[in-house]
Amino acid sequence: MTTAEDVAGNPYISDPRTDFESVEDVDAETAREQADQLREALRYHDYRYYVENDPVIGDRAYDALFSRLQRLESAFNLDTDGSPTQRVGGEPLDELPDVEHVARMGSIDQGGEEADVREFDSRVRNGLDGDVQYFCEPKFDGLSVEIVYEDGVYQRAATRGDGEVGEDVTENVRTISSVPQRLRGDYPDFLAVRGEVYIPRDAFTTFNRERVERGEDPFANPRNAAAGTLRQLDPSVTAERPLSIFFFGVLDASVDFESHSELHERFPEWGLRVCDRTAVVDDIDAAIDYRNEQQQARDDLDYEIDGVVIKVDDMDACDDLGSTARAPRWAFAYKFPARKEETTVRDIVVQVGRTGRLTPVALMDPVEVGGVTVSRASLHNPSLIADLGVDVGDRVRIKRAGDVIPDVVEVLDDDGDGHFEFPETCPACDSPVEHDGPMAFCTGGLTCPAQRERSVEHYASRDALDIEGVGEKAVQQLLDAGLVSDPADLYDLTVEDLTGLEGWGETSARNLVDGMDSAREPPLADFLVALGIPEVGTVTARNLAQEFGTFEAILDAADEGDTDAFEAVPDVGQTVARSIVEFFEGEGNRAVIDRLLDHVEPQAAEETDGDALDGQTFVFTGSLDGYTRGEAQELVERNDGSATSSVSGNTDYLVLGDNPGQRKQDDAAAHDVETLTEDEFEELLDDAGVL
């Protein structure tokens, strides 16, 4: 534990005097010495408050020390990296750029039944010799981030994103008081850590109340508030919100650790805040007991948890177990059951999704479920309404499935006097409703304004054409301003159109327009995904592109109603084939497609031998000019190669784009892996007959 003796002689540690002389009366040497002492003292007080939870001075004294340091640094130009004052919000950004993670931020296998966790334990013990100890910790319900320190100084932070690339939130995370700007003690030269950003419950309640008093909409739950705050473009907004963090893992470091429990002990020595509700247990029975104890305590905690994470404690054993393509074999998230509460249904409304699916939603008396006030719950489809027998005025039990989306699960009292009837026409466009099994769909296609709105967002999404700057908020702005009504309108946008909207700068506007220009010749498979054809995902779209070759051939088969031609495609059955034909038969859909074809020319799928890369393994780092990372990986995999996220002894090539990750280059050197520039990568593909 750090003590005041560690900073002996510093006058600002215990009961500090705050009646400073005027800055104008201080000479440069004295100012520099006093600023150094203040930085040291403020780091110490941050440590005592956030890590030790044992402050030695009050808030007023801390604020006085902080303010004095700010004035000294400003008056004498003494700003330094790692100063506590650097966490105050910086300049607003036009966008949050993407950044590649030091190491993959993978997900964890999870389950909510005891049988699930016992199966995990069985797999672990079958893969290891001897006894197994587990390190157990709460599963925080916040937003996971990567934070990088070099030589003990805070350098960078990023959201998890897709696990390989996240959003750069360096300046926003810098404002979080519990994130040290400089590490303490005998820290490693390089440290990339994983933490969970959250808003404490009490702070969330106060924060939401203040928003309502200002006439602003409250956040639905602490997690949404934390996520929205962390993605603010203006760090000064983030600085005013009550974010906190728990650190719980290492992604990469210049030192080794023998166990997860050792890691948990070392973090506080470096000033990194950890949760104190952890345990090392000798068997899975004790881990299950730990989980049950945390479930009992969850409502008394000042932070949201939705389960516990059980990890093999020994790091060497973790290495022996390894990982699957998506998750480590040495960890398991044992989830809590969904919370349930009672309330009364006041109305039932029907929402329209991107594919035209109609989803009934119950509007209810507000009820608190696990610290979150909810007033809406999904009823999923007309069949569920009939099965439950739910109606307006009924007393019902709801649960938060996965602690996120509320569902109505039971009618307790059906004495309500309402009588809900599922509509026969779409509430957004009055088109006839068609029933398919338990589900109901609007038949209006892209003539339906609700479907158009979702289709615009989907068209530009990462899974489709991956166009920068076209997210849910931007789409709503564009629709409200009358600038777009369907995906084709995106291609007509100008920088002048966009800079006239609130929150849009020259850079973000130019990025969107340039992104649309670069999407005028999309790969056929990506274009098919972007159209949002029901039942057609990435794999099916790729198979359709390979089988038909051109978009015109797909249109011809659809125009002829040739479901047999579609069923001949791998993974396409009767239901999917019929869905494809019906999509292209829709008049509204064809009108939008015809407009799109005025702007785009989908590129025919390249025919390849299929095994041109013959099992070679590629890793990509940095930004490529000619491909997105997904396109490059898909190109490799289509030709019998393998694309992985990390360099190992099995890697054949590391392909370097712009701003490549240094860690992957170091790993390539350690494993004697050949590196390629993008031009060399394309030469290799050309020699193999791929291009």
Swiss-Prot record:
Q: Which UniProt keywords apply?
A: DNA damage, DNA repair, DNA replication, Ligase, Magnesium, Manganese, Metal-binding, NAD, Zinc
Residue span, BRCT domain: 608-691
Q: Where is this region: Disordered?
A: 1-22, 637-667
InterPro entries listed in its UniProt record = BRCT_dom (IPR001357), BRCT_dom_sf (IPR036420), DisA/LigA_HHH (IPR041663), DNA_ligase (IPR001679), DNA_ligase_CS (IPR033136), DNAligase_adenylation (IPR013839), DNAligase_N (IPR013840), Hlx-hairpin-Hlx_DNA-bd_motif (IPR003583)
Q: Which cofactor does it need?
A: Mg(2+); Mn(2+)
Q: Which SUPFAM superfamilies match?
A: BRCT domain, DNA ligase/mRNA capping enzyme, catalytic domain, Nucleic acid-binding proteins, RuvA domain 2-like
Pfam families assigned = BRCT, DNA_ligase_aden, DNA_ligase_OB, HHH_2, HHH_5
Which segments show compositional bias classed as Polar residues? 641-651
What family does this chain come from, according to its entry? Belongs to the NAD-dependent DNA ligase family. LigA subfamily.
What is the name of the protein in this document?
DNA ligase
> Species name for this entry?
Haloarcula marismortui (strain ATCC 43049 / DSM 3752 / JCM 8966 / VKM B-1809) (Halobacterium marismortui)
What is the organism lineage in this UniProt record?
A: Archaea, Methanobacteriati, Methanobacteriota, Stenosarchaea group, Halobacteria
